[in-house]
Amino acid sequence: MNSLIMVIIALIAAYFIGSTPAPYLAGRIFKGIDIRTVGSKNMGSMNVFYNVGFWPGILVLAVDIGKGALAMAVANWLGEGLGIQMLCALMAIAGHNYPVWLKFKGGKGGATAIGILAYLMPEGIPIYIACFLVLMAITRFPTLSYGISFLSFILVAWLGQHDLGKVLFSLLVVMIPIIMYIPRMKEIKNKAGSGNAKRAIFRKNLKERL
């Protein structure tokens, strides 16, 4: 088959893998709710944890992480090189954030980004988990904790002597969910008042943080 056609197939497959609306389905199946209307209204696993249940949250987290890794694995299975695999990873994030099934209103791409970076640099997983747990224990703020923990993958890419392309790609993957979360961070800050931003970050009800 023509190589261009294979690339197109890989990219389309990656988008549809990413667009699987696991948080939405979990809300509907396990509690009969639209996850986009409760809690933080985010189509993410943390919102499922707090408003649907622990095990549905675990399931959604696993699916969303798996989407990023699966998109790259499928491209690899189709015989595509690392460059195309990286493009497929970005398509998976695009699918997660803008799913065609939900009028292009999805999540922030955090868990999917974790799956991508874990597939690319599995040696970074223990460091990421350690960073997340430490920050979560200190701040009790999931968004801040895993947002900062993302930076550990960039450090792994750099110290692990990965090529510059992989380092820059890791930076791009990390920045996407961080940028997506900026409006949410501003919302929390505005609700608490400019003088109480710190209190909003460290004391705000957990159900509204993601």
From Swiss-Prot:
It catalyses: an acyl phosphate + sn-glycerol 3-phosphate = a 1-acyl-sn-glycero-3-phosphate + phosphate. Pathway: Lipid metabolism; phospholipid metabolism. Pfam families: G3P_acyltransf (PF02660). It is found in: Cell membrane. Probably interacts with PlsX. Belongs to the PlsY family. This is Glycerol-3-phosphate acyltransferase 2.
